[in-house]
Regions:
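Secretory/endomembrane lumenal or extracellular ectodomains immediately following the signal peptide
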Residues: 1-49
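Structural motif
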Residues: 45-52, 80-86
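Short, structured motif recognition centered on aromatic/hydrophobic residues
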Residues: 51-60, 89-90
Length: 110
């Protein structure tokens, strides 16, 4: 299976850094995942990139996906989500998820 043109484009636009080590150790899985998540899923529906990323960030807050949130935040900013929108997503989540999840996301990483 080859990586689709759409998945390649999405990767280069939103994840321009070094590739995940999984591309070396399990390229078949990564192609399957990338073609699904970065082509089939993103090309369904009418959400633009910024709206999709805001929904993803909110979902990651809800499932306490802190590490993945940190990975996807720069991509969300590249997609056009503003820092003010990121803060608003966090603020809105506090009422539903509590403050513990919020405070862990705002701690500096070392």
């Amino acid at each position: 299976m080859a990586l689709s043109a759409s998945a390649k484009d999405y990767l280069s636009r939103f994840f321009p850094g070094p590739p995940s080590p999984l591309w070396e150790t399990d390229p078949e899985f990564m192609e399957l995942f990338a073609n699904f998540a970065l082509d089939e899923v993103v090309n369904q529906g009418d959400l633009d990139d910024a709206a999709r990323m805001m929904a993803i960030l909110a979902a990651l807050l809800g499932c306490q996906g802190v590490e993945e949130y940190r990975v996807l935040l720069p991509a969300a900013l590249r997609a056009g989500v503003t820092p003010v929108q990121v803060k608003e997503i966090l603020y809105q989540s506090v009422a539903y998820l509590g403050t513990v999840s919020y405070t862990h996301l705002t701690l500096p990483t070392t």
